[in-house]
Amino acid sequence: LGRAMLRAAPITSGTISFNHGNTKYDVGAMSKMELKEYRKQAQLIFQDPYAALNPRMTVRDIIAEPLEVMELVQTREEADQKVREIASKCRLNLEHLRRFPHAFSGGQRQRISIARTLVCSPNFVVADESVAALDVSIQADILNLLKSLQNNLGLTFLFISHDLSVVAHICDTVAVMYLGTIVESAPTRSLFTQPKHPYTKALLSAIPTLNPEDRGKAQKLEGEIPSPVNPPSGCRFHTRCPVAEDRCRKE
């Protein structure tokens, strides 16, 4: 879904709309020129900070590349100024800009990746498991940085994650997907305290807890996961749902 929103994957059915000011984009029907303008507003933070950065480029050149590709600057001096500004916001200093990616830890590389994503001032950012490849000790630092950038720059994030503790920390609204279909969507606090869908309840019950009274309360889902290529009819979760009814197979 995140890749389709950025037109990095084909949209096989349905529509994706994006509003920016007075302009409304139909993402699936964009021309090449419209797509170029759209990508100034919608960007992606990759999951793996080790694979996402060109090892032959300095950090300065990595961050500046979107500005040059999208023709957002006229001179190198203008590009340098924008790079320094966004680097500072992502907690990178001038010395960092002169180095190559191999000199940095995973958390530092992810900050470089975030700076590259934000240098063209997008409004919408897809963060695809952006802390999953990092040590737990580093994850909190990156999450706090993303939250700070969201508040300071007015960003909207589509934060994709399998880690519900991370989701609870950073998201305002949560959508739970099963076999490619959204089964429940609600404000974060409401979804975590009063889940409605059986799949959401099963996910939340599997979160590790230090409370000994909760030991053994995780719901064990029976049966094999159906193929997303040929999903079940009705509610896609009904083949594994402990409370499924006949109507679930149809609706």
Regions inferred by a protein language model and the residue ranges of each:
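Helix-to-loop junction immediately C-terminal to a conserved catalytic motif
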Residues: L6
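ABC ATPase NBD Q-loop/coupling interface
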Residues: T15-E37, T75, L191
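Conserved ABC ATPase "signature" region
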Residues: N22, E68-E71, E77-E95, L204-S205
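Conserved ABC ATPase signature
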Residues: F100-F104, Q108
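A short, proline-enriched helix->beta-strand linker immediately N-terminal to the Walker B motif
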Residues: V119-N123
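P-loop NTP-binding/switch modules centered on Walker-like glycine-rich loops
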Residues: S130, L134, I138-G216
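Short catalytic/signature loops enriched in Gly
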Residues: P187-E251
